Amino acid sequence: MSASTAAPARDRLRIAIQKSGRLAEPARSLLAACGLSWRQSRDKLFCYGESLPVDLLLVRDDDIPGLIADGVCDLGIVGQNELEEQAAERRRNGLPAAYHAVRGVGFGQCRLMLAVPEEWDWHGVGQLAGKRIATSYPAILADWLERQGIDATVVELSGSVEIAPRLGTADLICDLVSSGATLAANQLKPVELVMESEAVLAGAVREPADARAGLLAMLLRRMDGVLKLRDSKLLMFRAEQTNVDALRRLLPDADPLVQLPDDGNGALRLQTMCHGAVTWQRLEELERAGAQGLMVLTVERSLA
């Protein structure tokens, strides 16, 4: 089916995620936190949704954008780098991407970077002229080089990019970097950022108009609630009115303070949702500023 062909009407939503790899478990955990559960098929590639009519396809990450573009899946959780690589390749072939990043999902952060041999004295992108650059992301790299006005040769490799300079097949590389340990092990150093990346929820540009539309809206609302609460805690305490302004200044990453019904002790009963780390040091600062009876609670679910 081509990207321009309308997908047949379905009453079940399909989501593609990695079968294995660094995004597989976080993606499945995120969807489970949204209330989804599945029954796995014998081939372990298809998971039938039991709690809701939302099925999973377990595939290679580089298959996910195409499955969305062709209407086989409605959504996918995939690295932004993979999504953009295939979109750039489609643009170069005169095809619409037919998919887009709906929202980031808070994991899988990495950077696509140029890395050169450690002995290089790096002065800037002008040094790339005439060089051979090995990468698994040729379309992204070609677009980036074009924007920089650099004429260099892109050497496409499907794996083991980091050994290309030692093998003599390239002068430098463009590859994903998380910790930098792999680069260091191959006597390479990162020198230039090409793209920031993270895992994203990708979806078709044309949203479904059948029974899936309601499922999609519900899933996105649940996911927003899960993502908002991922690093959030409910903070409850008592305080005198004269201390409220000082306490509010100590909570710049929190929602507005909510006053609860009086418990008869004279002080105000307050609560707020904190969206950053609530450390012991932070609680002690609040206590010194007048907060009493501090409690930090984990919140599992929320509908905004």
UniProtKB/Swiss-Prot annotation:
**Metabolic or biological pathway, per its Swiss-Prot or TrEMBL entry:** Amino-acid biosynthesis; L-histidine biosynthesis; L-histidine from 5-phospho-alpha-D-ribose 1-diphosphate: step 1/9
Q: Does the keyword Nucleotide-binding apply?
A: yes
The catalysed reaction is: 1-(5-phospho-beta-D-ribosyl)-ATP + diphosphate = 5-phospho-alpha-D-ribose 1-diphosphate + ATP
Q: Which Pfam families does the record cross-reference, listed alphabetically? A: HisG
Q: Which InterPro entries match?
A: ATP-PRT_HisG_long, ATP_PRibTrfase_cat, ATP_PRibTrfase_CS, ATP_PRibTrfase_HisG, HisG_C, N-reg_PII/ATP_PRibTrfase_C
- Keyword ATP-binding found: yes
Gene Ontology cellular-component annotations: cytoplasm
Identify a single GO molecular function assigned to this protein: magnesium ion binding
Needed cofactors, names only, are: Mg(2+)
- EC number, UniProt record: 2.4.2.17
Give the EC class as a word: transferase
Q: What is its main location?
A: cytoplasm
Q: Which UniProt keywords apply?
A: Amino-acid biosynthesis, ATP-binding, Cytoplasm, Glycosyltransferase, Histidine biosynthesis, Magnesium, Metal-binding, Nucleotide-binding, Transferase
Q: How is its activity regulated?
A: Feedback inhibited by histidine.
Q: Which CDD domains match?
A: PBP2_HisGL2
Picking any one GO biological process from the record gives: L-histidine biosynthetic process
What is the recorded function of this protein according to its Swiss-Prot or TrEMBL entry? Catalyzes the condensation of ATP and 5-phosphoribose 1-diphosphate to form N'-(5'-phosphoribosyl)-ATP (PR-ATP). Has a crucial role in the pathway because the rate of histidine biosynthesis seems to be controlled primarily by regulation of HisG enzymatic activity.
Membership in a protein family: Belongs to the ATP phosphoribosyltransferase family. Long subfamily.
Q: Which HAMAP family match?
A: HisG_Long
Protein name, per record: ATP phosphoribosyltransferase
**Native species:** Xanthomonas euvesicatoria pv. vesicatoria (strain 85-10) (Xanthomonas campestris pv. vesicatoria)
